[in-house]
Amino acid sequence: MIRLFRLTTGEDLIGTPDQDTTTDDFQGIKQPFVLIPMQGEPGKPMKIGFHPYIPYTQDKVIKIKKANIITETTPDNNMINAYQQNTGQLVTPPKAKIITWL
């Protein structure tokens, strides 16, 4: 399950918790990305950039000290889809709705 993490540094990370590397002191996160707010064009909504948390590592799981995690939340569907696109995962399509005409 993809989760959002806010760190004591103010960074927001998105990734998948990894139970195999999580300990009492460390939270393992698979493919963590830092969310970077980016100013769009004037009058347009702000955009979110996705950047690898530690771009120069070959490791797929990064361990973060639990003491440095302020909170953990569930991202909205748009954020999940954007993360899946950035990590090469299949994007979950929205649930189909049936429309009937009377």
Regions found by a protein language model. Give the residues of each.
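Conserved RNA-binding domains used in RNP assembly and mRNA/RNA metabolism
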Residues: 1-102
